[in-house]
Every structure is written in structure tokens, then in C-alpha cells.
Regions:
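Short, well-ordered alpha-helical segments
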Residues: 2-39
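Short, conserved loop-to-beta-strand elements that form functional interface hotspots
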Residues: 39-47
Length: 74
């Protein structure tokens, strides 16, 4: 685990539940970011159909990951 971290903010949505939306955002982040250590839910929202039932849940996450230590050459 790196002693230096960086935090990025990402948003995404999924049908089903807030948890599904969180998992979707984290899974997508993991395809390009390594050493994800934690997340914080910053905002939760959603979309509804004509009857008022939720159709999608939207989340905004702060995702923290470790920064790789420099490699010493020599």
C-alpha cells in the first residue's frame, strides 16, 4: 500500500439499487485505476418513470487509490 494517495470523483448509474450503482462505478474505475483503497458516496440521485417508481440510481463517488512509488534505477 502506497503512503501517497490520490482521490478522484466519478459518477455513474445503474438500475436496481444504489449498491448496484456503486458497484458499477467501482468496477469501471478498476479497469484503469489500480490500488483502489476506499470510496465515499458524495451524492445519490435517480430517475423515475411516469408512475414515480425509480428506474435508475445515480451515485457520485470520491475514489481513493495509492500512487506507485518511484522505481530506483541504478
Amino acid at each position: 500500500m502506497s503512503s501517497i494517495t490520490k482521490t478522484i470523483r466519478l459518477s455513474g448509474k445503474a438500475g436496481g439499487s444504489i449498491e448496484d450503482a456503486v458497484r458499477t462505478v467501482l468496477a469501471r474505475a478498476a479497469t484503469t485505476v489500480s490500488d483502489i483503497q476506499k470510496f465515499t458516496i458524495v451524492k445519490v440521485g435517480g430517475e423515475v418513470d411516469d408512475s414515480g417508481a425509480p428506474t435508475f440510481f445515480t451515485v457520485t463517488l470520491d475514489i481513493t487509490f495509492g500512487i506507485k512509488d518511484p522505481v530506483e534505477h541504478g
